[in-house]
Each structure stands twice: as C-alpha cells, then as structure tokens.
Amino acid sequence: AYPSRQCTLWAYLRRSQLSLPVGSYMGNGADWANTARGLGYLVNNTPHVGAAMVFARGQSVGGHWTADWQYGHVAVVERVNADGSVLISEGGTGFATFPAWETISNAGAYQYVHY
C-alpha cells in the first residue's frame, strides 16, 4: 500500500475515483513509469486527462519546486489546456492541502502513464 498523504497515495486514490485502473503498488513516484512499462502500459510524453504524470528524482516540477531526490513525484492530469499546459492534482507532505493543484506549463518534459 501507499504511505499516508504521499503523492503515490493520492495518485492511486484519484485514479480510483475516476474509475481508471492503477496497480496496488507501483513503487515510489519516480518508479511509476518503469513499473507501468513492465506491466505493458503505454508511457510517453503526451498528457491526457487521467494519466499519471511522473516526475524523475530531482526533476523540476514546472519550475515551482523540485521532486524529491530519493522518491521522485507522481500526480494526476486533471485537464490539458489549449496552450499545452496541464492542471494536475497531487499529494505529498509538503503541501498545505491534500490534494494540492497546480498548472505545469512545460508538460512535454514529463512522462505520462496511459492505462
């Protein structure tokens, strides 16, 4: 299972709310892309609503902050905007709210898991 209030728990819960499949344990945030590939899911750099958005260890999260150097980060795409940016929902102990929401402008720089 996933630790309380962490990004992985939120991604699991949100995809469940959306009636989208997600494995019971995909690893740490940065691991979701490789785990999904191993399970036969498509992983690429094209966002779509409901996709798990994967941030590598230490990767900039839209220029706002940096994903954890040990665990990385994972979020869920809520909307793809006309300008190519994405609105994401995310969890993690560093946020004041659970979930938190933010817009990422350089959406093509990240990996997306398409279940």
Name these PLM-found stretches.
Residues A1-A82, S89-E90:
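Secreted/periplasmic proteins that engage bacterial cell-wall peptidoglycan
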